[in-house]
Amino acid sequence: MVWLDEYMQCLSSLMTAGVTHMRTLLQSSSKEGGRSVLDDNYLAITAIVTVLYQFSFFLIAAGCKFDKVTDFAGSTNFVILALLTAILHNTWYFRQIVLTVLVGIWGVRLALFLLFRILQWGEDRRFDDKRENLLKFAAFWIIQAVWVWTVSLPVTIVNASDRNPDIQAADIVGWVLWFVGALTEAVADQQKLAFKNNPANKGKWCDAGLWGFTRHPNYFGEILLWWGIFIAATPVLKGGQWAVIAGPIFITAVLLFLSGIPLLEASADKRYGGLAEYRRYKTRTSPLVPLPPSVYGNLPSWVKKFLLLELPLYNSKLTD
């Protein structure tokens, strides 16, 4: 994939040059006393960059009905915001470097994986009912822009801060949670891709590896890693900055109640709901938190529902 390497090198060069030029302009247009014309937390510039970045890819996707750039645009946007805020503030404290690197590793890994997958599959079925409806398609991209900006808030605030307290337990806990979450997501993605690419598994749902312990291990990993990022950011937060908890709450809510688990459960129920073995799989397999099937399958229904999030929403398309 030589074209991809060239694209990434070009993107990196353009972004570095652009950010350097932007910082020069901002410094030259500062108010008296050295205060930037932008807000101290870089909320405006990250919002502007996110909107412009997503809009540019939306034009490609909508104009060419081209699904291959959608997830790539979302994942790489996180990396751009983390690097942008780090370069603009230019303090490079250890905590800032670590969080920027963690977001970069996650974003690049996910972007390349999703790009490789969509190149194999050819199209994204999520957009089957949206490609011909510009308003629906635009709504998806608007939500994606809000998702990127909101979930990036903890790293944005850390990179914009002059506070640099010593490394604390919260940092270590956050980094560990990120590592466990990122590893879980990466392993789950590879296991499912390998399962789907095996002709022997055609017409089957994935229950291999981590997918035998939870129906959505990739989402469990993603939720865990973003809560880890938030926890690692807490030593820097003060006052109203604690509102950045909206980031992990937002990604958790989206995956649990909106475009994550509900959509995939409905799709799987529609496709496999008539199979007794699939119903047994759902009964014995946790929707999110990994647990041995022998444990989860024997838990009382109230424990599954109230503690492990086996919500009625996840069975709405399962007919009797």
Per-region residue spans from a language model:
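Hydrophobic transmembrane alpha-helices
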Residues: 2-23, 40-54, 77-107, 151-191, ...
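Juxtamembrane membrane-interface segments at transmembrane-helix boundaries in membrane proteins
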Residues: 22-40, 129-130
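Short, hydrophobic transmembrane alpha-helix segments
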Residues: 32-38, 58-68, 87-91
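C-terminal ends of transmembrane helices
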Residues: 55-66, 112-118
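Juxtamembrane helix-capping/reentrant segments at transmembrane boundaries
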Residues: 66-79, 122-140, 204-211
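Select subsegments of transmembrane alpha-helices in polytopic membrane proteins
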Residues: 72, 135-148, 215-222
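A basic- and aromatic-enriched beta-loop-alpha substructure that forms the phosphate/nucleotide-
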Residues: 95-131
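Interfacial transmembrane-helix boundary/kink motif in multi-pass membrane proteins
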Residues: 98-101, 125-143, 167-172
